[in-house]
Amino acid sequence: MKKHNFNAGPSILPREVIEKTAQAVLDFNGSGLSIMEISHRAKDFQPVVDEAVALFKELLNIPEGYSVLFLGGGASLEFCMIPFNFLEKKAAYLNTGVWAKKAMKEAKAFGEVVEVASSAEATYTYIPKDYTVPADADYFHVTTNNTIYGTELHEDLDSPVPMIADMSSDIFSRPIDVSKYICIYGGAQKNLAPAGVTFVIVKNDAVGKVSRYIPTMLNYQTHIDGGSMFNTPPVLPIYAALQTLRWIKANGGVAEMQKRAKEKADMLYAEIDRNKMFRGTVTDKADRSYMNICFVMNDEYKDLEADFLKFATEKGMVGIKGHRSVGGFRASCYNAMPKESVQALIDCMQEFEKLH
């Protein structure tokens, strides 16, 4: 039976990315060695990093003066590195979910943190829009897609100060005006690669402005100067990321990824809105995520939640259980998710509806 992988992360990767990475695990570039056992300074590996950086810049139209870094530690480490490197006195944060809240918590150790707005009172079921960013803030931090709650910023915001964004779960799913940001970062295990590598796009001249001492490994300048090679980088995930970047380019680039994402999301949201048994959880439909589609049983069918989960699992659906903090269901439809799998979930929902 075909499995349909709706996991929120680590998550689905294009089949050809898995196959090419698997081949490299057995024999990298005809070297007779696995990519897991070569030196990161081997002559065959530097071109992997160089091409991955070049494709990042090409696909996202990154302006001159920015570096692309491949680091470790996940977005969770970036929550600390961001204020360490950029917060001198005051930073502004938009609180749209657990991950934004965690980022804010880390920033408070380095300076004043202004929460410009929050949707916590509504369990983060919408993205606040009525707020003012302080003009004297060092930066304005946003989380562009909220995997737990299914909300997403579909366009870059305007800000009177430089912006920083956690784009862990929607990178390469839409065009970005990178010039609005001094830093874009994320864990790669949702839309780019297997777990283990963190991507950072950083504006070079924004680094080195704070007065505090920054430990070597937490200083972006270290990694800019070292070309992501100051210490041993996550070799295998970087290689897989390169294969994904090639796949995105071969499949029409970021604009095509956005088109496909909207088509898949529209299909599933239409069924959620039509089906008598389900309802969406996001209160403002304009905020509905294309990446993580969250829904619950309507109240009169609430006692059938476990039955639907079992039914869907038997039909090959994987990873549709909602996050433990909110319950319900979540279908993560990242770039690699085929439309056929979304249709399979819709068919499953319709079949379950007919049974009840």
From Swiss-Prot:
SUPFAM superfamilies with a match to the protein in the record: PLP-dependent transferases
Alphabetized InterPro entries for the sequence: Aminotrans_V_dom, Pser_aminoTfrase, PyrdxlP-dep_Trfase, PyrdxlP-dep_Trfase_major, PyrdxlP-dep_Trfase_small
Keyword presence, Amino-acid biosynthesis: yes
Highest taxon listed in the record's lineage: Bacteria
Cofactor stoichiometry and binding remark: Binds 1 pyridoxal phosphate per subunit.
Pathway: Amino-acid biosynthesis; L-serine biosynthesis; L-serine from 3-phospho-D-glycerate: step 2/3; Cofactor biosynthesis; pyridoxine 5'-phosphate biosynthesis; pyridoxine 5'-phosphate from D-erythrose 4-phosphate: step 3/5
Modification N6-(pyridoxal phosphate)lysine, positions: 190
EC primary class: transferase
Keyword Amino-acid biosynthesis: yes
Residues reported to bind L-glutamate: 41
GO biological processes: L-serine biosynthetic process; pyridoxine biosynthetic process
Localization, UniProt: Cytoplasm
Entry GO terms, CC: cytoplasm
Catalytic activity: O-phospho-L-serine + 2-oxoglutarate = 3-phosphooxypyruvate + L-glutamate; 4-(phosphooxy)-L-threonine + 2-oxoglutarate = (R)-3-hydroxy-2-oxo-4-phosphooxybutanoate + L-glutamate
One MF term in the entry's GO annotations: O-phospho-L-serine:2-oxoglutarate aminotransferase activity
Cofactor: pyridoxal 5'-phosphate
One protein family per Pfam: Aminotran_5
Binding site for pyridoxal 5'-phosphate: 75-76, 99, 147, 166, 189, 231-232
Enzyme Commission code: 2.6.1.52
Keyword terms: Amino-acid biosynthesis, Aminotransferase, Cytoplasm, Pyridoxal phosphate, Pyridoxine biosynthesis, Serine biosynthesis, Transferase
Biological role stated in the UniProt entry: Catalyzes the reversible conversion of 3-phosphohydroxypyruvate to phosphoserine and of 3-hydroxy-2-oxo-4-phosphonooxybutanoate to phosphohydroxythreonine.
Family designation: Belongs to the class-V pyridoxal-phosphate-dependent aminotransferase family. SerC subfamily.
UniProt subunit comment: Homodimer.
Name under which the protein is recorded: Phosphoserine aminotransferase
Organism this protein belongs to: Phocaeicola vulgatus (strain ATCC 8482 / DSM 1447 / JCM 5826 / CCUG 4940 / NBRC 14291 / NCTC 11154) (Bacteroides vulgatus)
